């Protein structure tokens, strides 16, 4: 999981069974705020200033990046990265709402607006 104190939210995911969730930490209590039917296999990147989380979603032998609103769980954007393997090497933030994706055989730069 990753804690996002600016939003009183903890983000959790299940790489084996699938699932992505935002868990509220308001008032030092844990409560599920939102859930998405996704299958992340990599660590997310958090953009606290825009309230966005970027993580991969590996399904049906294809990987994509998704952008999620941290507070609401709304899926804001998604982009295929033309990867057949998501072994979780890394996601790295760029400089302006962009991210670098690297896995075996694939390197991509993804920008969203």
Regions inferred by a protein language model and the residue ranges of each:
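C-terminal closing repeat unit and adjoining cap/tail of repeat-based domains
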Residues: 58, 62-106
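Structural motif
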Residues: 17-22, 61-66, 106-113
């Amino acid at each position: 999981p990753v804690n996002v104190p600016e939003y009183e939210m903890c983000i959790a995911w299940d790489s084996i069974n699938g699932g992505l969730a935002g868990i509220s930490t308001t008032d030092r209590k844990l409560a599920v705020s939102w859930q998405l039917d996704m299958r992340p296999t990599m660590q997310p990147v958090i953009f606290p200033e825009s309230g966005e989380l970027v993580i991969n979603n590996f399904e049906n032998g294809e990987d994509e990046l998704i952008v999620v609103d941290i507070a609401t769980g709304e899926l804001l954007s998604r982009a295929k990265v033309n990867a057949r393997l998501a072994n979780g090497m890394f996601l790295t933030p760029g400089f302006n709402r962009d991210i670098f994706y690297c896995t075996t055989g694939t390197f991509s730069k993804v920008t969203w607006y």
